[in-house]
């Protein structure tokens, strides 16, 4: 593993541009390289456009080739990207075997061992919902739109006065409500990265 401090961000079509832009400014300004990864379907690279069509990213790092030991943490970007990444071309008989879900399982194992940070924001807990074993018993925050998905997958959504809280931390899992929380989310995520 190199001495360069790096974080991994999983991304796909329909990602949230606000988060994308803030990640690209905040983390490098605080000493971290940001690497984007997606499932490339056998291609050398793929380009993805954000929800509002104001940002585009070309990714050449396939999820199936990621070595999590190269990173201190991983963020699942918001928007609809994680819904796309949990897609399986053929349904498995047991648990979801999409490459992104398998990578998340590895990340959660490292996170639970106290060696890795995982962050989600807005709708990106959808990737956790693909395998309820990943979310069961954890407290999180998320977009109101996916509240039922998260609860049905075994998560406990933290609320205050009928709204999900802005940012919540459960061990090394940091969750943010929506893009409006991205600055607060980034600060909490960075603080945890720096303690590893």
Give residue spans per PLM region:
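Active-site-adjacent pocket-lining segments in enzyme domains
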Residues: 3-35, 43, 55-196
């Amino acid at each position: 593993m190199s001495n360069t401090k790096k974080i991994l961000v999983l991304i796909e079509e329909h990602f949230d541009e606000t988060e994308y832009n803030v990640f690209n400014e905040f983390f490098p300004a605080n000493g971290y390289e940001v690497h984007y990864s997606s499932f490339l379907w056998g291609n050398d690279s793929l380009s993805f456009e954000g929800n509002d069509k104001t940002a585009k990213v070309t990714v050449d790092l396939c999820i199936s080739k990621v070595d999590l030991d190269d990173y201190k943490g991983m963020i699942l970007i918001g928007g609809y990207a994680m819904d796309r990444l949990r897609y399986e071309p053929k349904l498995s008989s047991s648990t979801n075997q999409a490459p992104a879900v398998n990578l998340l399982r590895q990340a959660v194992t490292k996170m639970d061992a106290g060696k890795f940070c995982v962050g989600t924001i807005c709708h990106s807990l959808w990737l956790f919902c693909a395998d309820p074993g990943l979310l069961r018993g954890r407290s999180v925050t998320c977009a109101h739109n996916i509240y039922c998905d998260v609860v049905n997958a075994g998560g406990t959504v933290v609320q205050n006065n009928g709204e999900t809280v802005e940012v919540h931390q459960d061990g090394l899992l940091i969750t943010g409500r929506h893009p409006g929380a991205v600055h607060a989310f980034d600060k909490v995520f960075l603080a945890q990265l720096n303690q590893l």
